[in-house]
Amino acid sequence: MASTAKKSSRSASGRVNRTVRGSPKATASVSRKVTTAATIRKIGDDWARHWNAGELDGVVAAYAEDAVYLPPHHEAVHGREAIRRYLKVPLGHSVSDLAFEVAYIKQQGPIAWDVGTYRMTIPQSDGTKKEDRGKYLSVWRRVGKKWLLAADAWSSDLPPSA
């Protein structure tokens, strides 16, 4: 049985490079998964940046043509254009300061899933602001060389307003 030794190093770009002696296939797999997680984190960060800037096109560009959006207290929204119409309303109400904290990202072939928490500020009709926090689950699908949201679900940790 061949011995495998692991070695990690950080490149100038900050990417962790792992080598597993005796297992080039394992090395390629680890490298691809690290790259996938970093790519998905960046897309998520860009999504939040576009959201906070009120840039609907940038938000919607992250979704696959046949994506499903699963917001709390609402029926499922199917398709990129339907998601665009649905998101136009809250985006127009200045929901802001949206930030995600990724708990983990896993990948299996052309599918990846991203689990974490979010927080955001929601302006109220009386001029006050309401803080919200909750969790999300996003399913990503690789289309060519791009990762796109195939399913996006979230729910607040706070009780619904009366």
Question: Over which residues does each language-model region extend?
Answer:
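Polar/charged side chains located within well-ordered beta-strands of beta-rich proteins
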Residues: G44, Y63, D114, S138-W140, ...
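A short, polar/proline- and glycine-enriched secondary-structure boundary/capping micro-motif
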Residues: S125-G127, P159-A162
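A short, structured loop/turn motif at beta-sheet edges
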Residues: I105-A112, R141-K146
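Histidine kinase transmitter module recognition
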Residues: H50-W51, P90, V139
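Short, low-complexity N-terminal intrinsically disordered segments enriched in polar/charged residues
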Residues: A2-E65, E81, P160-A162
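Short beta-strand edge/turn micro-motifs at domain boundaries
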Residues: R133-P160
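A solvent-exposed, acidic/Ser-Thr-rich amphipathic alpha-helical stretch
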Residues: T36-T39, I43, L56-Q108, T117, ...
